[in-house]
Amino acid sequence: MLRSILGTVFACMLGLAALALAPYAAWAEKIDAIAGLGGRWAGMGTIVPASGPSEDFKCVITYFPSEDGTRVRQNLRCQGVNHRFDAAKHLQIDGSEITGRWKENIHSLTGTVSGAVTEEGFVILLSGEFFEAKMTVVSSRCEQSVTVVPERAGQMKELAARLRKC
């Protein structure tokens, strides 16, 4: 049960990584958006559990985009009162398609990322052995936001987070 809860919460946290991938229509714009990821982003989020009070958490995400804008490596460290995460994520960007893999180091969880670019950001599916969650991402130059809703709301109803770089 703990792994299931941690898997669901971690899937939500992974969404933060995708926040920095701003929407783009042309290849040149995509390179600029991916290059803009580089650096440290920090912010706050809230987990709304299936029952009980919401929990706030702090998060720092560092992005390492490739020069050609087709790959992004992300390091994620987040901490709340009851949750702590340390993860790495690798994304591939091919036109409007996003694929990738993630690994959470504390709880030994792994999974895949798949999704598509939309006009405002992304709709992404996070998959793992213990969860599946749909994520809606909206991004601007200095601020990133994400809403994650698990397919099964047994442990969590929603996660919402905001990060800033500027």
Q: Where do the language-model regions lie?
A:
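Positively charged n-region of N-terminal signal peptides that target proteins for export
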Residues: M1-S4
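Bacterial N-terminal signal peptides
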Residues: V9-A22
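Central antiparallel beta-sheet cores of small beta-barrel/beta-sandwich binding domains
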Residues: W27-V138, T147-C166
